[in-house]
Regions:
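Cysteine-nucleophile active-site neighborhood
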Residues: 53-122
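A glycine-centered loop/beta-turn motif at secondary-structure junctions
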Residues: 152-153, 162-202
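Short glycine-/small-residue-rich Rossmann-like dinucleotide-binding loops
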Residues: 15, 51-53
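Short acidic low-complexity segments
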Residues: 32-43
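Pocket-forming structural segment of enzyme catalytic cores
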Residues: 93-165
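Short acidic/histidine-rich motifs immediately flanking catalytic phosphotransfer sites
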Residues: 41-51
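N-terminal beta1-alpha1 ligand-phosphate binding loop
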Residues: 8-30, 183-184
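Structural signature of beta-strand start/N-cap positions in the alpha/beta core
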Residues: 31, 46, 80-82, 140
Length: 203
């Protein structure tokens, strides 16, 4: 993968370990910066919203830092944004994990608990890329999730995976990409995905 000189900003709210995300971009020749203020979200050239842990704690951290409005405005304007794992789930209206807690509401869909016997989904699983995907190719990605998005939001392009039932692996619209899996932990395949996102599409 060719190094791509871009300014990448990673949202750091204290509830997600961003070290592996930062390291993944450094491997691409990009020096990312951690940010935590709304004006930084607005000004970011390329923005990453990582997420690990509980839906409610992540939304509380976002709201305490007054980031929700800036994140919504950025995504609705289709500015380059990558949401990872819980980051994807935060774009929904709500989650079964945290009843009564609102998400960012980019989509009307609710995040639901995996119906599989094996929960969480932990490890490698196949991603079947949409033929219309700008960023993904079919391959294997690393997952760590107990909740998921099961339906494709209107106006978005979904790629899929199967964990004792079909679920959304990633959704994209213009320069916005949200992945349930961890591209930063998905080896060369994940590295290509990050490079594709930075480059505006598959090479």
């Amino acid at each position: 993968v060719n190094p791509i000189p871009k300014k990448v900003s990673v949202v750091s709210t204290g509830v997600a370990n961003v070290a592996s995300v930062l390291a993944a971009f450094r491997r691409l020749g990009v020096e990312p910066q951690e940010i935590s203020r709304p004006e930084q979200v607005e000004q970011a050239e390329w923005l990453v919203l990582p997420g690990v842990g509980a839906f409610a704690a992540a939304m509380r951290a976002i709201e305490e830092r007054a980031l929700a409005g800036a994140l919504r405005a950025r995504i609705e304007a289709a500015r380059p944004t990558l949401a990872i794992c819980l980051g994807l789930q935060l774009l929904a209206s709500s989650s079964e994990e945290s009843p009564g807690v609102s998400g960012l509401g980019i989509w009307s869909e609710q995040i639901v608990r995996l119906s599989a016997e094996r929960v969480p989904q932990l490890g490698w699983n196949r991603v079947v890329a949409s033929a219309n995907s700008r960023f993904l190719e079919t391959g294997y990605a690393y997952y760590a999730n107990s909740f998921c998005l099961q339906t494709e939001p209107a106006g978005w392009t979904a790629s899929w995976t199967d964990h004792e039932g079909k679920l959304v692996a990633a959704v994209e619209q213009d320069a916005v990409l949200a992945c349930q899996f961890h591209p930063e932990l998905s080896g060369p395949w994940g590295e290509r995905l990050l490079a594709n996102w930075l480059g505006g599409g598959r090479c």
